[in-house]
């Protein structure tokens, strides 16, 4: 007998194109939608970077000798390579036409998360502090609406040993980031010993499927009735420490 247990709603929202010259905050914009308690609001990092004016014009960049040399190997403009280097702690892997770095946030990804997509001009790094951005947006929404919500800032990144990019959570506020389920029992009463769920990543990927990664124009997703604890989670707790990384 099949029994319905969970019914989650995913709502993709179109918003005005963000230029960076807005006279309103993201919290104010999002609060114009009829939110409900325990909605999880997932926002594309592009929107956050643009409204925070975290876009760099190419004529403001002076490429270093290292950037000039790398640009030849990577087939990228020296200005873009310079921003990639500026946003990184270290180069993890370098090859023909690709560069994998550890960003200043601790993410290991291609190009330090830097790109020019969905930006009319300039080069767009990731938000400087995604957890702080998520926190400020959440607090603003809760102040305006009186609703208790969670906020996730997501980005699409490639995955080792898997093809295709997938949405991940880079900033989290108001919901659990890493859900530690150790000590709970499985269906047969056995105690879980190692289970940790990257629940914020799972929600980020769910939202990313609706957002799309081309010209869909849906940078905001509301996830309603999500089976997630509403705790003080962060995106940082999803980052594996270097000393725990068996591949580096």
UniProtKB/Swiss-Prot annotation:
Cofactors that this protein relies on: Mg(2+); Mn(2+); K(+)
Note accompanying the cofactor annotation: Binds 2 divalent metal cations per subunit. The ions could be magnesium and/or manganese.
Residues that hold a divalent metal cation 2 according to the record: 156, 213
Catalytic reactions of this protein: oxidized coenzyme F420-0 + GTP + L-glutamate = oxidized coenzyme F420-1 + GDP + phosphate + H(+); oxidized coenzyme F420-1 + GTP + L-glutamate = oxidized coenzyme F420-2 + GDP + phosphate + H(+)
Keyword Methyltransferase: no
PANTHER family per UniProt: COENZYME F420:L-GLUTAMATE LIGASE, PTHR47917
Name of the molecule in the record: Coenzyme F420:L-glutamate ligase
Species of origin: Methanococcus maripaludis (strain DSM 14266 / JCM 13030 / NBRC 101832 / S2 / LL)
Recorded name of the encoding gene: cofE
């Amino acid at each position: 007998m099949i029994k319905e247990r969970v019914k989650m709603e995913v709502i993709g929202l179109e918003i005005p194109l963000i230029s960076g010259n807005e006279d309103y905050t993201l919290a104010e914009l999002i609060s114009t939608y009829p939110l409900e308690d325990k909605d999880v609001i997932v926002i594309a990092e592009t929107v956050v970077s643009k409204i925070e004016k975290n876009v760099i014009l190419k004529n403001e960049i002076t490429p270093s000798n290292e950037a000039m040399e790398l640009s030849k190997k990577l087939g990228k403009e020296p200005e873009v390579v310079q921003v990639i280097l500026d946003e990184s702690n270290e180069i993890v892997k370098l090859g023909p036409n690709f560069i994998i770095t550890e960003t200043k946030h601790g993410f290991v990804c291609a190009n330090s998360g830097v790109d020019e997509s969905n930006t009319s001009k300039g080069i767009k790094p990731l938000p400087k502090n995604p957890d702080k951005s998520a926190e400020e947006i959440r607090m603003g929404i809760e102040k305006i609406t009186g609703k208790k919500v969670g906020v996730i800032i997501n980005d699409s990144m490639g995955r080792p040993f898997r093809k295709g990019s997938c949405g991940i959570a880079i900033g989290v506020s108001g919901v659990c980031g890493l859900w530690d389920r150790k000590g709970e029992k499985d269906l047969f009463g056995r105690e879980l010993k190692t289970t940790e769920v990257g629940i914020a990543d799972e929600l980020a990927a769910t939202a990313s499927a609706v957002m799309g990664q081309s010209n869909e124009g849906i940078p905001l997703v509301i996830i309603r009735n999500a089976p997630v604890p509403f705790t003080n989670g962060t995106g940082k707790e999803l980052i594996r420490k270097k000393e725990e990384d068996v591949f580096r």
